[in-house]
Each structure stands twice: as C-alpha cells, then as structure tokens.
A protein has these predicted regions:
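AMP-dependent adenylate-forming
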Residues: 7-29
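Adenylate-forming
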Residues: 9-12, 33, 37, 44, ...
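Conserved pre-ATP/AMP-binding loop-to-beta segment of ANL
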Residues: 17, 142-161
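ANL superfamily AMP-binding
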Residues: 18, 31-56, 86-88, 92, ...
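Conserved AMP-binding/adenylate-forming
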Residues: 26, 42-86
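Short beta-strand elements of ligand-binding domains
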Residues: 59, 82-83, 105-106, 121-131
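Residue-level detector of anion-binding/catalytic polar loops
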Residues: 78, 101, 123
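Conserved ATP-dependent adenylate/AMP-binding module captured primarily in the ANL superfamily
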Residues: 86-116, 135-141
Length: 163
C-alpha cells in the first residue's frame, strides 16, 4: 500500500530543482519543499502522530503552512484547517469534536487555545505568518528523507468544517 495522495501530488517532483513556489522574497524548488516537508513529517511522528490522527491548524497562510499540509499527509495524518476568524467558543467546539493530536496556531491565538489543547490532550505548536514559532523551531531538529506513511484510498486526508 502506498500513500496515494502524497505519491500522486508531491512525490513525482520530489527531486526536481525547478521552482515550485514563488513568493515575494524567495523561490522554492520542489526539492527544497520536499526537504521541508520531510523535516515537518518527521517532527510530527516524533511527537506521536499516528496514521489517521488529526492535525488542527489555525494559522495565516505561508510556505511553512503549505508544507505542514503536505507533511501531515505524508506522515499519514488528517489535516484540519480552521478559519483564523473563529472565536474561542467555535474553536472549543471544533477541536472538541475532531480531537486532534496536534494543534498549530499563531502566537497571538495561543493563549486562548492553550486550555482547549490541554483539555483534549493535544500538542500545541505555534506558527506565525513570518514562519516563526515553535513548529519551525522543532522542525529544524529533524532531518530527512522521510518515507511517506502508507494510506488507503478510503482513508481521510482532511476534515473541512463548513457553516
């Protein structure tokens, strides 16, 4: 069994030096993006992520946020994006319902989310739009390559709450 989503979308280009992402201040090749996702995936697994575990994310868009999505899929997790405009009561509902093992949020929102994460037993990490935070600090401690965790075609890749 393979990880069909990661293998179909990201793996075919993993070693390419061609530019994958263009940002205002840098260009990122497929290979550099893969190395970044490998470090994040290894970090998630080291923190206890198992196949099917949820990773809830309420953070501003950035390259690292996109890499977190790819890394979650690669590590066999289920990505749970949460709108940055949700109130603490809404977050309490969504996090209580989904029961993620990890929660990623901005430093500014961490104070409100910390008691919720503690109540559900989730690891709390921070990630700001400038890519600073405990997630980036923890990820640099890990090296790749990271082999994608096998997932079946019926396994979840993401959970999207709607209004």
């Amino acid at each position: 069994m393979s990880n069909h989503l990661y293998d179909g979308v990201f793996a075919p280009h993993a070693d390419s030096t061609k530019t994958f992402l263009y940002t205002a201040d840098r260009d990122i090749s497929f290979a550099k993006f893969t190395a970044l996702t490998d470090r994040i995936a290894a970090m998630l697994v080291a923190q206890g992520l198992a196949p099917g575990d949820r990773v809830a994310v309420q953070a501003d868009k950035s390259v690292l946020l996109f890499a977190l999505y790819a890394a979650t899929v690669k590590a066999g997790g289920v990505y749970l994006p949460l709108n940055t405009g949700y109130t603490p009561a809404e977050l309490d509902y969504f996090l209580g319902d989904a029961k993620p093992g990890s929660v990623v949020t901005s430093n500014a929102a961490a104070e409100a989310i910390t008691p919720i994460a503690a109540r559900i037993g989730a690891v709390l990490m921070t990630l700001d739009s400038d890519e600073s935070g405990s997630l980036s600090e923890a990820a640099v401690q890990h090296e790749g390559p990271f082999t994608a965790v096998p997932r079946g075609s019926e396994d979840l890749a993401a959970i999207l709450y709607t209004s």
